[in-house]
Amino acid sequence: MTTQLNINSVIENAKRVITPLSPISIFAARNPWEGLEADTFEDVAKWLRDVRDVDIFPNKALIESAVARGELDESVFNQLVTDMLLEHHYNIPQHYINLYIDNIKTLKDVPASYMNHSNVDVVADLLLEKSKRDMAESYHHYDVRPMSDAIIDEQGEPLSEQVNRQMIKWTKLYIDQFLSSWTMPKREQSFYHAWLHLAQHDHSFTKAQRQVIKGLPNDPKMTIESVLNHFSIAQEDYQAYVEGHLLALPGWAGILYYRSQQHHFEQHLLTDYLAIRLVVEQLLVGDEFKSVTKDCESRSENWFKQTVASWCYYSDMPSDVLLQHDVNEIQTFIHFAATMNKNVFKNLWLIAWEMTYESQLKQKIKAGHESVAGALDVNQVNVTENDNANQSHSVSLNATQAVDENNSELNQVGTSTKAQIAFCIDVRSEPFRRHIEAAGPFETIGIAGFFGLPIQKDAVDEQFKHDSLPVMVPPAYRIKEFADRYDMNVYRQQQQTMSSMFYTFKLMKNNVMPSLLLPELSGPFLSLSTIVNSIMPRKSRVSLQKIKQKWLKKPETKLTIDREFDRTSDLPVGFTEQEQIDFALQALKLMDLTEAFAPFVVLAGHASHSHNNPHHASLECGACGGASSGFNAKLLAMICNRPNVRQGLKQAGVYIPETTVFAAAEHHTSTDTLAWVYVPDTLSALALDAYESLNDVMPMISEHANRERLDKLPTIGRVNHPVEEAQRFASDWSEVRPEWGLAKNASFIIGRRQLTKGIDLEGRTFLHNYDWRKDKDGKLLNTIISGPALVAQWINLQYYASTVAPHFYGSGNKATQTVTSGVGVMQGNASDLMYGLSWQSVMAADRTMYHSPIRLLVVVQAPDFVVARLLANNEHFARKVSNHWLRLMSVNEEGRFKSWI
């Protein structure tokens, strides 16, 4: 029992190296390093380079591209290098240090000829022999790696590749529940038991290997322990060994991790997976592991050779000259080369890139407020800053204070505003909001797209229920969509007719005899569909929508807002009256909308439209778990229109005028249009005027927003009709890049809208409304940081990882992806499950970067004590900042910027 508990603990701790991977149909951004944030970003980068040869720093080409585009100021980098050298003293001639730094900072690789030079071997052996204990251990420590990584097969590849192919085959078979007619036998018992049953008959194993499988224990934990003992792995190395196996196929391991969290009967899936993988490794390795030299020693020896070669190359000191020095001097040189390795300079380039963006963002805010200050006849805005030092910055933003100095002025602004539109914080809403505000007396607001409603939605036009909230939070309520009984019966019949047609097609395709007839039966129709979709994608989509509207028109629906009893539901259905009041109050506070209500308040979720796109869900609302957020917007708008809710809000200190009406809409990010989801039948005169005014200017807004967005797409030249072109892109099934999604996201600003209003943030910023003056205890800020900001960081790091290490964290080329098992994409039929973003989502061309891989900059508009309190109360966020997983900056009421590093 003690051993089994130990195995459980090992697996539980080892899960830190992977992240749960949701099916592609409900794709939600995940931070691939969330479980590793107890360590610094730099330490994790070094560890990943050691154990998987994965580099998570921007490479030389990305750095050079950033410099060429003006995104990275070289002077900032040079200052960082100077500051670093001043912190250390080395007893080395200065000209060697200068040569070394000048060469290594270009990130050029050491030529192979240096590694293969005999003198380098001599120096490395000398150091390893004389200084092994105090140098190899202090300079470099390697985790134990899977045995199969150290054995090379007859084809010249690590034996672990054969292990991977076996695991891909078996995991695909287990995961697939919907695409194949036959599922894996005995899968209902467990993955491990189903594999035991089938592997005994798998002739890819030898007869002797199949006999070993027959004799395996029924308990996967016992199997894991048996294999680890067979390989003589020390107990203190169990976790590192298991981590190596999880990192071998992080995609397939990730989907199993996700399923283990979703279903109680699959909670031990990772244990089953590891037991199978370790057995396969044992069978394929056989007795060869006995002849394998100690991996750590050989890697330490190789590390010495690399470090010696680096010193000789970058310092321009020939190896024969190096040999003329005594051992102590050589140790000093190599210590310097080890300390000042290439990863150190990659990290400095990354920091300089981030500091450059931080400086440019402050300059944008400064320039924006200078223009506002001139218009309001307030004091001139002065900026004094030392960007290279990256310390506190002083910017006098008197314009902000002039705009919203007190509540009376805020109320005055509110009465002149026709409509207030609350958008999701998604970076794609920033340009759209800017164009709306420029088009008339409209005010925009930023809030997470789930609008603070922890719900699971049960929509009439969706086959499955969906958790419509951030993936790190479980739903607490279920909201059902329903219509009049007659309308629902008609709609259900239409749905069944359509689904039966698709089911019949699938059934024929997956069975031997009927599949022979299928080409003749479906060929003419599918050929015509292919031609029309290829030649006239936009018209084809419009025609399809008309047919769908005629034959499968969704009826007018209502929502189960009030609490209902449903014995079939594992969640409460609907809200109590007090819960409705509480959620409305919380949402309004998060929007910083508790006074000065406009006559018309629109809650705008967002959705994306694309055709033939497996990663469609990645373009939807991240705060709603990879789905459109119009459902949440409609629910909150309906709640806020209820008289009893308004009465409760009034008692809580929030008065909504009777003339104010809430409505819901969706911002379609691929076409930059606003589609109405819910507009009450009765509008006040002022609300009706605002509604009509907004509709009148929306075509112009859409044209401007689309033109700005399409100009950034690499395959488009001059656009004369941006709206039509955007619709064509969204309809074209051959288009690999219907929109950029959240590429280039870089910052998350939490503050009053006046801080950034009218400033072109280039669609790179998440914008969340917040007023620290109304948040006395800091709970609102903590909520924003723990929810929306966390989602934004996950999105940011997924884009980052997919850019810097696309082979490991991305999903490859869209044109060669294969949708597999209904859960994700592969490259070919024997790759890992690709769980990141495609190449086209982050790159403009094969060698042209689009997304800028920098860590998220969180900006909080609040005094220092508010930010200090946040860091003291939120240890999870404070750790992200201190371990360099994101950057934090604040701006106080006097306009002084401060970097919290």
Curated annotation (Swiss-Prot):
InterPro entries assigned: DabA (IPR018752)
Family that this chain belongs to: Belongs to the inorganic carbon transporter (TC 9.A.2) DabA family.
Keywords from the UniProt entry: Cell membrane, Membrane, Metal-binding, Transport, Zinc
Lineage: Bacteria, Bacillati, Bacillota, Bacilli, Bacillales
Binding-site list for Zn(2+): 424, 426, 606, 621
Main localization (coarse): membrane
Membrane topology, from the record: Peripheral membrane protein
GO cellular component, one term: plasma membrane
Organism from which the protein derives: Staphylococcus aureus (strain MRSA252)
Subunit structure of this chain's protein: Forms a complex with DabB.
Subcellular location: Cell membrane
Record's function text: Part of an energy-coupled inorganic carbon pump.
Needed co-factor(s): Zn(2+)
Protein name: Probable inorganic carbon transporter subunit DabA
Gene Ontology MF, one: zinc ion binding
A Pfam family: DabA
